[in-house]
């Protein structure tokens, strides 16, 4: 579960920290209030493309840190240990980008390649945007969902059927 998001010198935000409560959280506000900036910052800390354009005017760099409670995500803890990263109940993801475009990613204080952050994010977060339900209208979507739900068991059954 996402516990907090801390954003420093990102776009128009000098310093902002959002603490999340367990359950459902909602960002609301008028146009221009900064909701999209927070969503963009969250994407960056999860491994999305980070442009130097996000560095706040007058700053040398920005950083974004997200803290997750991973006590109920044992497969993530196993992955972290495989990567040589100490796995505790709190997971700290941090991404820093300089005005020159240099990026640095850390997990629990250990510098990692961006690919590690992206892999971790797939085990933690599922982000859905506006109109993404349209993907369900594609012909292959229902089959993909059934295959994903069935997992390896479905693939084994299909292989056995094809062998007959």
Show which residues each predicted segment covers.
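Gly/Lys-enriched N-terminal cap/neck module of very large, oligomeric protein machines
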Residues: 4-145, 149-164
